[in-house]
């Protein structure tokens, strides 16, 4: 009772807190640990060239186990095979637009070890990375990747496909005498062929008794030139929190310093010493296996009885058979060739970025100096009937771009897949004492560079955008341009004031819907 009264007296005697004032508390600096905000999409540089090292997951080790009973004191082998390592896969997707979301080092999960009672280890999870449509893969080191098409032939068991991934048709649970004789050679290039013998029958009988079904998931791998893109694999789940084993740290020792995003975006476009081009991913859903997982080691239940009883093989070859195979490693260079409906082509400072901002909601960097745009910018032009056209702002081209002058190859590769070419010409290049190039000569130089880079590129549907019509004397220059270039749609505009932009939108739509559009021929351009 007295304690309750004492607590009440203390509560009454405590002073009240001071009234809140209008003065707030401000931090001089941001709290520690808070990440800075990411720059908006328009101000971030487009990463269209990327270096990637990939390693498949190692196979799990086979289990060495004996099952003893009253009738069999020595015991029978019942160790299961190790699981196959996961693959590293590139998946083509429309949800990404460059390589900024990729990691320079990718590694799939390791297969689980086999256990007793003839239980096979779980297959390692695949590591899947999404790349934009139009990605070109070049191989520097490692084995050649291959596109894959899934064709399941029967109902699949969850332990066979933990993440709905492919499994090699050469299962690690099958054995043969050829494998036993070639142990001294490289095991990574060998597979285990099935043979009718007692050891194999015991192995497969143990698998069926444990699972009830044949644990095989056949996958057909096809070459790049044979892939028709008609059948795409289903979505595959990926564990983003995959942790690597300590025994795999050797893969990362050679590359301790990873490139920052700023180093990648500011990286110069140099000629890479690549051996050959591997594939081009142009359709959503295509998947490319760039690093394969290693096969799992054999358990003693699937090893020939003669080898198990032989003392000569028991220590050396038995240990090598039960060890899982390492995954393959590859070093790739990814390049992006933008896939857009319309490509804005022109000399530096012709007003291409300003025109893109007038046609769409894209906000590229705009300045009054040459080569403001070093990475292509893509905007979307939407019409009233919800018809959408993708417009790409290609960086400025100069004379000799086809010889890689002024990063020409890095810019020209983005034009290869555009359906329509819009030549943006500067009408005011020679006005008011400017030492520029007349618009008809600009057009001739652009046509020559495109034709030298890829024959037939200028035969695509084309139109001419005569920019900066608001300058004094630009009307006379435009009339002279119409006399020198004929047979091509021409639109005089002022991109910064958006004069003539609505007519240009209609012209682009008509050119997209035209049944027999015409390109630009060099012979139809009259130059002094």
Swiss-Prot record:
Span of the transit peptide along the chain: 1-45
UniProt entry tagged with the keyword Transmembrane helix: no
SUPFAM superfamilies: Obg GTP-binding protein N-terminal domain, P-loop containing nucleoside triphosphate hydrolases
Molecular function terms from GO: GTP binding; GTPase activity; magnesium ion binding
Region (Disordered): 52-87, 167-212
InterPro entries assigned to the protein according to its UniProt record, in alphabetical order: G_OBG (IPR031167), GTP-bd (IPR006073), GTP-bd_Obg/CgtA (IPR014100), GTP1_OBG_dom (IPR006169), GTP1_OBG_dom_sf (IPR036726), OBG_GTPase (IPR045086), P-loop_NTPase (IPR027417)
Sequence similarity: Belongs to the TRAFAC class OBG-HflX-like GTPase superfamily. OBG GTPase family.
Record's protein name: Probable GTP-binding protein OBGM, mitochondrial
Species this protein is from: Oryza sativa subsp. japonica (Rice)
């Amino acid at each position: 009772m007295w304690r309750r009264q004492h607590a009440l007296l203390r509560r009454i005697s405590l002073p009240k807190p001071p009234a809140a004032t209008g003065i707030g508390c401000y931090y001089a600096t941001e709290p520690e640990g808070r990440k800075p905000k990411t720059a908006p999409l328009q101000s971030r540089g487009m990463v269209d060239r990327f270096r990637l090292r990939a390693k498949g997951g190692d196979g799990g080790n086979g289990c060495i186990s004996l099952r003893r009973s009253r009738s069999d004191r020595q015991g029978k082998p019942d160790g299961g095979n190790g699981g196959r390592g996961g693959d590293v896969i590139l998946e083509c997707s429309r949800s990404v637009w460059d390589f900024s979301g990729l990691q320079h080092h990718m590694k799939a999960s390791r297969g689980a070890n086999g256990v007793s009672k003839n239980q096979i280890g779980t297959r390692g999870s695949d590591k899947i990375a999404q790349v934009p449509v139009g990605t070109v893969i070049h191989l520097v080191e490692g084995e050649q990747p291959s596109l894959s098409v899934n064709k399941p032939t029967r109902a699949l068991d969850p332990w066979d496909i933990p993440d709905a991934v492919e499994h090699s048709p050469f299962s690690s649970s099958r054995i043969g005498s050829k494998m036993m004789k070639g142990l001294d050679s490289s095991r990574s290039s060998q597979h285990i062929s099935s043979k009718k013998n007692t050891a194999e029958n015991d192995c497969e009988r143990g698998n069926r008794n444990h699972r009830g079904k044949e644990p095989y998931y056949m996958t057909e791998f096809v070459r790049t030139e044979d892939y028709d893109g008609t059948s795409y694999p289903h979505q595959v789940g990926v564990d983003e929190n995959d942790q690597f084993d300590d025994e795999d740290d050797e893969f990362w020792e050679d590359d301790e310093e990873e490139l920052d995003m700023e180093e990648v975006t500011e990286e110069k476009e140099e000629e890479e010493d690549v051996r050959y081009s591997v594939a081009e991913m142009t359709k959503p859903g295509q998947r490319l296996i760039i690093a394969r997982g290693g096969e799992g080691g054999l358990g003693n239940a699937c090893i020939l009885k003669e080898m198990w009883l032989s003392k000569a093989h028991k220590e050396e070859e038995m240990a090598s058979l039960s060890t899982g195979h390492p995954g393959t490693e590859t070093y790739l260079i990814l390049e992006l060739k933008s896939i857009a409906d319309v490509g804005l082509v022109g000399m530096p400072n012709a007003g291409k970025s300003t025109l893109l901002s007038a046609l769409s909601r894209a906000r590229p960097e705009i300045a009054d100096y040459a080569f403001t745009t070093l990475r292509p910018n893509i905007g979307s032009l939407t019409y009233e009937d919800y018809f959408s056209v993708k417009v790409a702002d290609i960086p400025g081209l100069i004379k000799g771009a086809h010889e890689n002058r002024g990063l020409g190859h890095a810019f020209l590769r983005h034009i290869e897949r555009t359906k329509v070419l819009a030549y943006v010409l500067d009408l005011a290049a020679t006005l008011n004492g400017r030492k520029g190039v007349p618009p008809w000569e600009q057009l001739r130089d652009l046509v020559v560079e495109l034709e030298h880079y890829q024959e037939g590129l200028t035969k695509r549907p084309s139109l001419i955008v005569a920019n900066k019509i608001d300058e004094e004397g630009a009307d006379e220059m435009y009339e002279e341009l119409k006399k020198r270039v004929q047979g091509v749609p021409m639109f005089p505009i002022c991109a910064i004031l958006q004069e003539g932009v609505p007519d240009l939108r209609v012209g682009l739509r008509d050119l997209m819907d035209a049944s027999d559009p015409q390109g630009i021929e060099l012979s139809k351009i009259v130059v002094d």
